[in-house]
UniProtKB/Swiss-Prot annotation:
It is found in: Lysosome. InterPro entries: FAD/NAD-bd_sf, Prenylcys_lyase, Prenylcysteine_Oxase1. Residues 1-28 form the signal peptide. Keywords: FAD, Flavoprotein, Glycoprotein, Lysosome, Oxidoreductase, Signal. The lineage of its organism: Eukaryota, Metazoa, Chordata, Craniata, Vertebrata. This is Prenylcysteine oxidase 1. One of its GO terms (biological process) is prenylcysteine catabolic process.
Amino acid sequence: MGRFAATLVGSLFGLGLLLCGLGRLASAEPRAPPEKIAIVGAGIGGTSSAYYLRKKFGKDVKIDVFEREEIGGRLATLKVQGHDYEAGGSVIHPLNLHMKRFVKELGLSSVPASGGLVGVYNGKSLVFEESSWFIINVIKLVWRYGFQSLRMHMWVEDLLDKFMRIYRYQSHDYAFSSVEKLMYAIGGDDYVRLLNQTLRENLKKAGFSETFLNEMIAPVMKVNFGQSTDLNAFVGAVSMTAADSNLWAVEGGNKVVCSGLLQASNSNLISGSVMSIEKTRTKQTGTPPKMYEVVYKTGSEIHSDFYDIVLVAAPLNRKMSNITFRNFDPPIEEFNDPYQQLVTTLIKGELNSTLFSSRHKDQFGLSAILVTDDSDMFINSLSIVASVSHKEGPPPAVDGMHVWKTFSKDILTKEQISKLFLSYDYAVRKPWLSYPYYNPPQKCPSIILHDRLYYLNGIEFAASCMEMSAIAGYNAALLAYHRWNGNEDMIDQDDLYEKLKTEL
């Protein structure tokens, strides 16, 4: 959720999810496509699944996308004095090729993520300050941490080199029926184990020091996922890719990708809240019956419609979606896994730099401040941000004032804001349930809830970010397509990596 310099974790250059292109059709002869598909949720997962379902099933299927709030879901913006700023998913890695492809095919433009120098604060002083000189940063890191930053680079690179396999599988139209099977196909038991072990446990076994974990790793976890090193090791590795120096965003806000995908898929948007999904009791006839009835509310009116396939692309936590499943035998599992509250606050003000450093404010050059694990600060991070339409990064300060973004667990009080800023003109906040609470061992919710009922957001319990949601959307579309057409040989295949190497 922010741009963090690569030097915070040493030589973490060029890390990311390496993605392949999209590929061939399944070999089995497809039957007639379904008539109607419902997708619940118009975030990146829901709209990307609509996009890929259209590509797989063709032009004749009707796709309804339900959204009770705004298109984009947690890719939301906040307005400060007439300008929009990212409040949710903010940055995209240069090798997130799903997102890059969307931007290219939809005719959108990219902008560099907000840059600047970063510091790490322990509640008393800055334990690390980034320099504009690369060699100075290297000396600082080696002096304080030895070669642990280089070893961290190698650890993350090894994990993500394996993760790239999922994109080769998807480029050949292979799908997976569970998150665990997807993870196993990528890297075997060692990869699945990442979900069941904390990042701290993993890195301590690898020989990383407490000082390095507290000052270099925990701050990145806190700003990206609101937790420390107690989250699972896989989401920890994904989080570390935010140390890349070439992060970008979509001009106009990342949420415009969702509206673009919705339009490109020729889907029908229904602005309403889905109340229940019921398995129908329709008797079998010559044509496949509509298997599910979706009951939804628009304004004060309640409606319903029938669908062949339903994809749920919204968290099924009761505090977030509150969808009731009726007439399923066995019953659909309950989804009680908690999501974390995150409060995004945008403040236009003059930073109280003496809170972090004894230097005069004119000599305080940091644009972002992260906090260590043992800090008693009431925020997770603080950074200067640019509006979604500003191509050149944050504009120069006016009367010493910038627009700053903070992440915190609780709503900031006026006293807390006044502690952070010498003065401020404006503050706007958005509290929301932003991502799962990671508590390994991590069991991911099922993807297949019923014969033609699919759940995308279980992948968030492996890691939550835009690209993971796009991967989940593509996987769900492939899974629905293959199961509709009986292409069992395209689902959960063993030894795919070796098989595809042989094909090449």
